[in-house]
């Protein structure tokens, strides 16, 4: 089921078998090293996204502009995910991950995405806060956080990375001008 966010921007669930080659190409590029899949073969990437698809607390979507995929957007429930053990979790938290696809993005894409994705997450009345936790070494991601309305939280040592937590509160969120 495709979720229309505006006239040109939409989310559609990842279909591991048919989207596997696309995702494999994205997550095995050096710029995606923080996703930890640089050396994964195609079949393992498909298995990972099949697992995500089967879990009620996880979801993966392709962010599409004019029906073309330009980014990967994932959501998770920190109450179930191991991430929830590393920060002061609250009821109504939803974690998100975002990986931009390669290439020059179309005009208007980034602004629409950063306006509509948090708005879509907050369309669930139970969501009170969006949790982001990129690798602290991912300067591009960390520097973007305040520009999209996120408040930087603590850096936390985790088994696979040092996470820079950031939070977008429902009560204080307005669509950013990116």
Region roles according to the model:
Residues 1-5, 13-20, 28, 67-178:
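Acyl-donor (CoA/ACP) binding surface of acyl/acetyltransferases
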Residues 5-7, 56-57:
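Short, basic and Ser/Thr-rich N-terminal targeting/leader segments
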Residues 20-24, 46:
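Short amphipathic alpha-helical segments
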Residues 25-39:
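Helix-loop element at the rim of GNAT/NAT acetyltransferase active sites that forms part
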Residues 39-60:
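Active-site rim helix/loop that mediates acceptor-substrate recognition in acyltransferases
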């Amino acid at each position: 089921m495709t979720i229309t966010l505006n006239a040109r921007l939409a989310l559609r669930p990842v279909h591991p078998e048919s989207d596997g080659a696309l995702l494999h190409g994205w997550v095995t590029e050096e710029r995606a090293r923080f996703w930890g899949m640089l050396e994964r073969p195609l079949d393992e990437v498909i298995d990972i996204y099949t697992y995500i698809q089967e879990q009620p607390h996880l979801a993966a979507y392709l962010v599409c502009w004019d029906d073309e995929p330009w980014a990967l957007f994932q959501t998770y429930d920190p109450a179930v995910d191991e991430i929830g053990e590393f920060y002061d979790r609250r009821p109504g938290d939803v974690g998100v991950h975002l990986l931009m696809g390669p290439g020059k993005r179309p005009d208007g894409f980034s602004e629409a995405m950063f306006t509509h994705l948090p708005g879509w997450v907050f369309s669930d009345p139970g969501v009170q806060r969006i949790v982001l936790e990129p690798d602290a070494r991912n300067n591009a991601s960390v520097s973007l956080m305040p520009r999209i309305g996120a408040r930087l939280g603590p850096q936390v040592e985790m088994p696979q990375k040092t996470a820079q937590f950031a939070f977008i509160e429902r009560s204080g969120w307005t669509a950013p001008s990116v």
